[in-house]
């Protein structure tokens, strides 16, 4: 370890101990040196004994900075890793940190724009940030070319080395988990960290976020349900992103929405429809839809429209996963647990040798209590959560896109019920899912598939005569080969029959000669000639078998 890594490790240990997180170390022989070592650090007492363990963990992660905050947020979606009281606290982690100097942001913008001063591209650039988070911060300005108000998102300077150093330490901790916890290997901690690393590195590339926002905006162009601000891609780079400034009511400000006369029932239902439209129609969904990233337009409160920002994290599902997911939801709410278990095996989410009966029983045991509630009170997100947690006990592979989907669904559901507590998510989603599944089979699906494949067949059409000729020629050669093999097999069969016949005669002569030699000595040389003849015939038959 480098001196810098040692200092950082010391700071992390000191922070964990000051919040009493040594309680998380399991009491076993392997951890005895760790526990004894903790007692030797008597000058680092637990300074927060009045707080519960989950809250202490959350505060410690916030103190450690952006990498650990985001790691905690991601872990909050993996409720198979922690008890509910800890997972609930991790879900409260806020990605808000002190802003960095606006002059540094200005220098980064000028570097990204080829060294020209900010004033060459923007008017009214505000040196004070509008918002600040762990990875980037946002400044307001006005485009010089057309006078439109924009926000400029800038990556924090020197954030990458900090992230890389902390990730190394997190990887080291992850490698210890299978040794410290009896169930540690099944939890695949290294895969969890690898998944987190990919998400974090993606967030550092603002060109990727720009592309995501452009795609989402195109998907919901002219939609009354969702508006994505325009991205000015000519001004975007890996460290800087420029997009339209929006004005809206934060979705968490229920009082302001009600004051504006917003149709809260329609707004809540539209949130559900937006989510399922992204997942099943577009196969491309905003995977960071927490309340801080969602606003509601001031205009047309009777026909409310969401505004989505911060498209750094997105997810996608392939056709097979979408179909299995939709069928899983419908089977779940029909309480067809056998179907759910079979779908998991068919999809490859769990190993093919999984015992379907045992899996069905495990799902039933976990989920039946949920369905004792009225459907309107059942959490779609928690159903999915229980399903995945149960499947992981049967060695379900970590599916990053499904984890993102589960997290997003929990956000959507939480926001929807905050806006309209009577929201029946299943009643809103079921017609959409049934319509989508119906659209995937029958004549409409066949017509769509033919339409999708038409360009391919048009391109291949001129090659078809040649392909047919080649196939016929290969078929002719194949027939010759088959005939040749058949003849050889026939010859071999005849040869084998002859050899078996000769071996039988040889053995008979040999046995007859032996019998006569013992019982009829008066026959003279005859038994001997029979035995010699038997050996000769047997040898001839044996040679034919080779």
From Swiss-Prot:
One of its GO terms (cellular component) is plasma membrane. The keyword Mitochondrion does not apply. Pathway: Cofactor biosynthesis; ubiquinone biosynthesis [regulation]. The chain crosses the membrane at residues 501-521, 522-542. It comes from the Bacteria. Its EC number is 2.7.-.-. It is a multi-pass membrane protein. It is found in: Cell inner membrane. InterPro entries: ABC1_dom (IPR004147), Kinase-like_dom_sf (IPR011009), UbiB (IPR010232), UbiB_bact (IPR045308), UbiB_kinase (IPR050154). Keywords: ATP-binding, Cell inner membrane, Cell membrane, Kinase, Membrane, Nucleotide-binding, Transferase, Transmembrane, Transmembrane helix, Ubiquinone biosynthesis. GO terms for biological process: regulation of ubiquinone biosynthetic process; ubiquinone biosynthetic process. Its main location: membrane. ATP binds at residues 130-138, 153. GO terms for molecular function: ATP binding; protein kinase activity. Residues 124-502 form the Protein kinase domain. Is probably a protein kinase regulator of UbiI activity which is involved in aerobic coenzyme Q (ubiquinone) biosynthesis. This is Probable protein kinase UbiB. The lineage of its organism: Bacteria, Pseudomonadati, Pseudomonadota, Gammaproteobacteria, Enterobacterales.
């Amino acid at each position: 370890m480098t001196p810098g890594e040692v200092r950082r490790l010391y700071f992390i240990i000191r922070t964990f101990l000051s919040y009493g997180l040594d309680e998380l170390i399991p009491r076993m022989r392997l951890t005895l040196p760790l526990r004894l070592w903790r007692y030797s650090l008597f000058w680092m007492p637990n300074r927060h004994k009045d707080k519960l363990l989950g809250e202490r963990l959350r505060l410690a992660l916030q103190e450690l900075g952006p990498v650990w905050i985001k790691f905690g947020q991601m872990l909050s979606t993996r409720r198979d890793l922690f008890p509910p009281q800890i997972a609930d606290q991790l879900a409260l982690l806020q990605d808000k940190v002190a802003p960095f100097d606006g002059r540094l942001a200005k220098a980064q913008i000028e570097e990204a724009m080829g060294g020209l001063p900010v004033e060459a591209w923007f008017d009214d650039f505000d040196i004070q940030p509008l918002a600040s988070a762990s990875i980037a911060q946002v400044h307001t300005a006005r485009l010089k070319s057309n006078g439109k108000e924009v926000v400029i998102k800038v990556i924090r300077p020197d954030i990458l080395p900090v992230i890389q150093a902390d990730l190394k330490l997190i990887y080291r901790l992850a490698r210890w988990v299978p040794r410290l916890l009896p169930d540690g290997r099944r939890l695949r901690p290294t895969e969890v960290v690898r998944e987190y690393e990919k998400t974090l590195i993606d967030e550092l590339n603002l060109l990727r976020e720009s592309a995501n926002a452009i795609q989402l905006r195109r998907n919901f162009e002219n939609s009354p349900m969702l508006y994505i601000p325009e991205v000015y891609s000519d001004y975007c780079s890996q460290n800087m992103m420029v997009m339209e400034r929006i004005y809206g009511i934060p979705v968490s400000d229920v009082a302001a929405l009600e004051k504006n006369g917003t149709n809260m029932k329609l707004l809540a239902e539209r949130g559900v429809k937006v989510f399922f439209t992204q997942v099943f129609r577009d196969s491309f969904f905003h995977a960071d839809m927490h309340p801080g990233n969602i606003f509601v337009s001031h205009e047309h409160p009777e026909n409310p429209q969401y505004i989505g920002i911060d498209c750094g994290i997105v997810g996608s599902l392939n056709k097979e996963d979408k179909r299995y997911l939709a069928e899983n939801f419908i089977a779940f709410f029909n309480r067809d647990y056998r179907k759910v278990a079979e779908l998991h095996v068919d999809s490859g989410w769990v190993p093919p040798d999984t015992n379907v009966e045992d899996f069905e029983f495990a799902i039933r045991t976990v989920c039946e209590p949920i369905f004792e509630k009225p459907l309107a009170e059942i959490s779609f997100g928690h159903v999915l959560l229980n399903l995945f947690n149960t499947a992981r006990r049967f060695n379900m592979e970590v599916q990053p896109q499904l984890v993102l989907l589960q997290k997003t669904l929990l956000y959507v559901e939480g926001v929807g019920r905050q806006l309209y507590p009577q929201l029946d998510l299943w009643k809103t989603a079921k017609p959409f899912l049934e319509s989508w599944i119906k659209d995937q089979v029958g004549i409409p699906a066949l017509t769509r598939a033919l339409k999708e494949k038409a360009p391919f067949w048009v391109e291949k059409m001129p090659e078809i005569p040649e392909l047919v000729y080649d196939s016929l020629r290969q078929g002719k050669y194949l027939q010759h080969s088959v005939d040749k093999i058949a003849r050889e097999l026939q010859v071999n069969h005849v040869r084998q029959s002859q050899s078996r016949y000769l071996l039988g005669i040889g053995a008979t002569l040999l046995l007859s000669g032996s019998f006569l030699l013992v019982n009829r000595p008066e026959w003279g040389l005859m038994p001997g000639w029979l035995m010699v003849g038997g050996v000769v015939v047997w040898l001839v038959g044996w040679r034919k078998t080779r």
